[in-house]
Regions:
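Short hydrophobic/aromatic beta-strand or adjacent loop that forms the aromatic wall/cage
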Residues: 7, 163-168
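Short, cationic low-complexity segments
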Residues: 180-190
Length: 190
Protein backbone atom coordinates (compact mmCIF):
# COMPACT_ATOMS: atom_id res chain seq x y z
CA UNK A 1 0.00 0.00 0.00
CA UNK A 2 0.92 3.63 0.28
CA UNK A 3 1.79 5.62 3.37
CA UNK A 4 1.14 9.25 4.13
CA UNK A 5 3.70 11.75 5.36
CA UNK A 6 4.89 11.03 8.89
CA UNK A 7 6.67 13.22 11.43
CA UNK A 8 7.33 10.89 14.37
CA UNK A 9 8.99 7.48 14.27
CA UNK A 10 9.61 5.09 17.16
CA UNK A 11 11.39 1.75 17.28
CA UNK A 12 11.77 -1.20 19.62
CA UNK A 13 15.16 -2.89 19.82
CA UNK A 14 16.42 -6.25 21.06
CA UNK A 15 20.17 -6.57 21.61
CA UNK A 16 20.72 -3.49 19.47
CA UNK A 17 18.66 -4.79 16.54
CA UNK A 18 15.58 -2.94 15.36
CA UNK A 19 12.58 -5.26 15.81
CA UNK A 20 9.63 -2.95 15.20
CA UNK A 21 8.61 0.55 14.15
CA UNK A 22 5.57 2.81 14.44
CA UNK A 23 5.11 6.04 12.47
CA UNK A 24 2.76 8.90 13.31
CA UNK A 25 1.76 11.70 10.98
CA UNK A 26 -0.85 13.89 9.39
CA UNK A 27 -4.42 12.67 9.12
CA UNK A 28 -5.00 10.99 5.76
CA UNK A 29 -8.80 10.84 5.90
CA UNK A 30 -9.41 14.58 5.82
CA UNK A 31 -12.95 14.84 4.47
CA UNK A 32 -14.11 18.29 5.53
CA UNK A 33 -17.47 18.30 3.73
CA UNK A 34 -19.14 19.03 7.07
CA UNK A 35 -17.33 22.39 7.15
CA UNK A 36 -15.16 21.80 10.21
CA UNK A 37 -12.36 19.52 11.28
CA UNK A 38 -13.15 15.92 10.26
CA UNK A 39 -12.56 14.58 13.79
CA UNK A 40 -14.57 17.25 15.64
CA UNK A 41 -17.63 14.93 15.62
CA UNK A 42 -15.52 12.36 17.52
CA UNK A 43 -13.72 14.47 20.13
CA UNK A 44 -15.40 17.89 19.98
CA UNK A 45 -14.21 21.13 18.38
CA UNK A 46 -12.04 21.99 21.40
CA UNK A 47 -9.74 18.98 20.90
CA UNK A 48 -10.14 18.29 17.18
CA UNK A 49 -6.84 19.91 16.18
CA UNK A 50 -4.87 18.08 18.89
CA UNK A 51 -4.82 14.67 17.23
CA UNK A 52 -2.48 12.63 15.11
CA UNK A 53 -2.71 9.47 13.03
CA UNK A 54 -0.81 6.24 13.64
CA UNK A 55 0.09 5.74 9.99
CA UNK A 56 2.11 2.54 10.01
CA UNK A 57 3.42 -0.08 12.39
CA UNK A 58 5.25 -3.35 11.94
CA UNK A 59 7.40 -5.81 13.86
CA UNK A 60 9.75 -8.48 12.54
CA UNK A 61 8.80 -12.15 12.92
CA UNK A 62 11.44 -12.86 15.59
CA UNK A 63 10.41 -10.07 17.96
CA UNK A 64 8.62 -10.84 21.22
CA UNK A 65 4.92 -11.46 20.62
CA UNK A 66 3.95 -8.37 22.66
CA UNK A 67 6.47 -6.04 20.97
CA UNK A 68 3.79 -4.25 18.96
CA UNK A 69 1.65 -3.54 22.03
CA UNK A 70 4.62 -2.26 24.02
CA UNK A 71 5.84 -0.12 21.13
CA UNK A 72 2.43 1.48 20.60
CA UNK A 73 1.83 2.03 24.34
CA UNK A 74 5.23 3.63 24.91
CA UNK A 75 5.05 5.79 21.80
CA UNK A 76 1.56 7.01 22.77
CA UNK A 77 2.97 8.21 26.11
CA UNK A 78 5.53 10.29 24.21
CA UNK A 79 2.88 11.64 21.84
CA UNK A 80 0.75 12.64 24.85
CA UNK A 81 3.74 14.46 26.37
CA UNK A 82 4.05 16.36 23.07
CA UNK A 83 0.50 17.67 23.50
CA UNK A 84 -1.57 15.26 21.44
CA UNK A 85 -4.95 14.42 22.97
CA UNK A 86 -6.01 11.56 20.69
CA UNK A 87 -4.73 9.26 17.98
CA UNK A 88 -6.62 7.77 15.03
CA UNK A 89 -5.60 4.45 13.46
CA UNK A 90 -7.00 2.15 10.80
CA UNK A 91 -7.06 -1.60 10.28
CA UNK A 92 -6.90 -2.81 6.69
CA UNK A 93 -8.88 -6.00 5.99
CA UNK A 94 -7.12 -6.36 2.61
CA UNK A 95 -3.85 -6.75 4.55
CA UNK A 96 -5.44 -9.26 6.95
CA UNK A 97 -5.74 -6.73 9.77
CA UNK A 98 -8.72 -6.85 12.11
CA UNK A 99 -7.51 -4.38 14.75
CA UNK A 100 -6.29 -6.92 17.29
CA UNK A 101 -3.42 -4.72 18.46
CA UNK A 102 -5.74 -1.74 18.97
CA UNK A 103 -8.16 -3.87 20.95
CA UNK A 104 -5.23 -5.18 23.05
CA UNK A 105 -4.13 -1.61 23.83
CA UNK A 106 -7.64 -0.36 24.74
CA UNK A 107 -8.57 1.75 21.72
CA UNK A 108 -12.21 2.48 20.88
CA UNK A 109 -13.59 0.98 17.68
CA UNK A 110 -15.53 3.50 15.56
CA UNK A 111 -16.67 1.13 12.81
CA UNK A 112 -15.67 0.77 9.18
CA UNK A 113 -15.53 3.55 6.64
CA UNK A 114 -18.37 4.00 4.19
CA UNK A 115 -16.54 5.78 1.38
CA UNK A 116 -15.48 3.73 -1.64
CA UNK A 117 -11.90 4.27 -2.74
CA UNK A 118 -10.78 3.42 -6.25
CA UNK A 119 -7.17 2.45 -6.87
CA UNK A 120 -5.47 1.78 -10.19
CA UNK A 121 -3.55 -1.51 -10.34
CA UNK A 122 -1.15 -3.12 -12.79
CA UNK A 123 -2.72 -6.13 -14.51
CA UNK A 124 0.48 -8.19 -14.37
CA UNK A 125 1.37 -8.10 -10.68
CA UNK A 126 -1.61 -6.40 -9.00
CA UNK A 127 0.66 -3.73 -7.53
CA UNK A 128 -0.88 -0.31 -6.92
CA UNK A 129 -0.02 2.25 -9.59
CA UNK A 130 -2.06 5.12 -8.11
CA UNK A 131 -4.13 5.08 -4.96
CA UNK A 132 -7.33 7.08 -4.49
CA UNK A 133 -5.54 9.97 -2.77
CA UNK A 134 -2.99 10.31 -5.59
CA UNK A 135 -5.71 10.06 -8.24
CA UNK A 136 -7.44 13.03 -6.67
CA UNK A 137 -4.25 15.07 -6.13
CA UNK A 138 -2.83 14.52 -9.61
CA UNK A 139 -5.93 14.18 -11.78
CA UNK A 140 -8.91 15.45 -9.70
CA UNK A 141 -10.70 12.13 -10.22
CA UNK A 142 -12.69 10.27 -7.60
CA UNK A 143 -15.57 8.56 -9.42
CA UNK A 144 -15.15 5.10 -10.93
CA UNK A 145 -16.67 6.34 -14.22
CA UNK A 146 -14.11 9.17 -14.58
CA UNK A 147 -11.22 6.84 -13.74
CA UNK A 148 -12.37 4.19 -16.23
CA UNK A 149 -12.65 6.86 -18.94
CA UNK A 150 -9.11 8.05 -18.16
CA UNK A 151 -7.82 4.45 -18.33
CA UNK A 152 -9.26 3.67 -21.80
CA UNK A 153 -5.96 4.29 -23.60
CA UNK A 154 -3.70 2.96 -20.82
CA UNK A 155 -3.25 -0.77 -21.32
CA UNK A 156 -2.06 -2.90 -18.43
CA UNK A 157 -3.99 -0.95 -15.78
CA UNK A 158 -7.39 -1.51 -14.19
CA UNK A 159 -9.57 -0.03 -11.44
CA UNK A 160 -10.05 -1.87 -8.16
CA UNK A 161 -12.32 -0.87 -5.27
CA UNK A 162 -10.61 -0.94 -1.88
CA UNK A 163 -12.43 -2.49 1.06
CA UNK A 164 -13.32 0.03 3.77
CA UNK A 165 -10.94 0.14 6.72
CA UNK A 166 -11.77 -0.16 10.40
CA UNK A 167 -11.27 3.08 12.33
CA UNK A 168 -10.00 3.24 15.92
CA UNK A 169 -9.38 6.10 18.34
CA UNK A 170 -7.20 6.30 21.45
CA UNK A 171 -7.77 9.14 23.91
CA UNK A 172 -4.55 10.44 25.49
CA UNK A 173 -5.56 13.55 27.40
CA UNK A 174 -5.64 13.92 31.14
CA UNK A 175 -8.64 12.61 33.11
CA UNK A 176 -10.69 15.81 32.62
CA UNK A 177 -9.89 16.08 28.89
CA UNK A 178 -10.71 12.42 28.25
CA UNK A 179 -14.01 12.84 30.09
CA UNK A 180 -14.89 15.83 27.88
CA UNK A 181 -13.96 13.95 24.71
CA UNK A 182 -15.93 10.87 25.84
CA UNK A 183 -19.10 12.97 26.10
CA UNK A 184 -18.87 13.48 22.34
CA UNK A 185 -17.37 10.10 21.48
CA UNK A 186 -19.50 7.76 23.61
CA UNK A 187 -22.53 7.51 21.28
CA UNK A 188 -20.22 6.77 18.31
CA UNK A 189 -18.38 3.79 19.83
CA UNK A 190 -19.39 0.51 18.17
Amino acid sequence: GTMGTTQYHFGIYYDGCLAGVVCYGYFQAMNTNSGGHPYAPYVGVKYSKNGIQLSRGACVHWSHKHSGSKLISQSLKTMSQRGYKYTIAFSDPEAGEIGTIYQATNWYYLGIGVTKHYNIHFKKNDGIYLDARDLWKKHKMASKKAIEEWLKDKSGLYVKVSKPKGRYIKLMGNKKENKEMMKVLNPLIK
